[in-house]
């Protein structure tokens, strides 16, 4: 159970364990228990959402936690809290379960929020909170989002 990093052989269908999760539970862990969010790996670091809503940065080679923050996800601990990450140029689009689109820079130095806008109402419920758990689509300089009631499109063009 829990996260682990596999090292794949280049010359054969073989893998070895690079590191495994440490900690007493999913709540008390140093790594990344990514339940719904697909983590993003860049420049030797992993960015993603842990199962209690902690947005984290880890060293990919060792699993060492560099930093974490609840700010981009729900602002506080929340079981199965979620956000989706999409890289765009030098920043990330982060769509959280509150319906916010966040533009941020992620680095081993930390989470730097550039802007945030609420784009769609959370219409579903889980663990006592309203949420939207659908991944947005990006095309033609626009973002497309949906909840259980509607589909919305917003231009992301710089003009």
Predicted regions span which residues?
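Noncatalytic, solvent-exposed loop/strand surfaces
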Residues: 1-159
């Amino acid at each position: 159970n829990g996260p682990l990093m596999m090292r794949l052989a280049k010359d054969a269908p073989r893998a070895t364990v690079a590191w495994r999760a440490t900690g007493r539970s999913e709540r008390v862990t140093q790594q990344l228990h990514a339940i719904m969010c697909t983590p993003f790996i860049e420049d030797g670091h992993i960015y993603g959402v842990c199962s209690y809503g902690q947005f984290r940065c880890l060293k990919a080679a060792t699993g060492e936690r560099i930093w974490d923050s609840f700010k981009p996800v729900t602002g506080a601990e929340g079981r199965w809290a979620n956000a989706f990450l999409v890289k765009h140029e030098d920043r990330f689009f982060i769509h959280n379960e509150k319906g916010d689109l966040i533009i941020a820079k992620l680095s081993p130095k930390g989470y730097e929020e550039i802007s945030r806008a609420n784009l769609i109402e959370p219409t579903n419920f889980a663990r006592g909170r309203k949420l939207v758990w659908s991944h947005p689509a990006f095309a033609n300089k626009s973002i497309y989002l949906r909840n259980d009631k509607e589909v919305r499109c917003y231009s992301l063009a710089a003009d």
